[in-house]
Regions:
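… and, occasionally, acidic/histidine-rich disordered N-termini of signaling adaptors
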Residues: 11-180
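Short, small-residue-biased leader/transition segments that mark boundaries at the very start
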Residues: 1-7
Length: 180
């Protein structure tokens, strides 16, 4: 019937409007997320040869990178938050903020100590008063580079470090435990 067709068209238009609203919100959230991560070009200024490969599967992502420097130490982080979509994207913001606090404010620069402190803060921050166990967390690689001393330090939480040298790839495994 004609009334049924009108109702279906209105319902489809309503769904289309809601879909567009959600997509606009997700795209805006993605631009905020990228602003939080910082400029790739600003990070790459610190390295003669380098690149950042960031190819999220969804509009907003649980993947993130982070960079900070404390005196002669350059700290680089690559992370993957558990989950997908918006919840994982929110975890990236939490991870970014906690790394700023741990490294830039508290001046913790050793990758293993950064992971320990991050783990503690995420567990405390996400603890549920009802005693319900949460499954939120991150897999992460952290490298601290001191070019003057020609030293690189690594720690990983379920993520390895890949070293490419003379067309060879070496893998250094991280721990089996995630953050959180």
């Amino acid at each position: 019937s004609a009334a049924s067709d009108v109702y279906k068209r209105q319902a489809l238009n309503n769904l289309d409007e809601k879909k567009n609203y959600i997509l606009d919100s997700l795209n805006y959230a993605a631009s905020i997320q990228m602003a939080v991560f910082g400029s790739k070009s600003q990070i790459l200024k610190h390295f003669k040869e380098g690149f950042i490969l960031f190819k999220p599967k969804d509009i907003v992502s649980g993947d993130f990178y982070w960079f900070g420097s404390v005196e002669d130490e350059k700290i680089v982080v690559s992370a993957d938050c558990t989950g997908h979509g918006v919840p994982a994207a929110l975890m990236t913001i939490m991870g970014n903020d906690l790394l700023n606090e741990i490294v830039l404010q508290d001046k913790i620069i050793h990758p293993d100590k950064i992971l320990e402190e991050l783990d503690r803060k995420i567990i405390n921050g996400l603890s549920n008063e009802n005693g319900v166990e949460r499954q939120d967390g991150m897999d992460m690689s952290i490298v601290t580079i001191n070019a003057k001393k020609q030293r690189i330090y690594f720690a990983g939480a379920k993520n390895p470090l890949y070293i490419i040298y003379k067309n060879e790839i070496d893998t250094i495994k991280g721990s089996f435990f995630p953050i959180g």
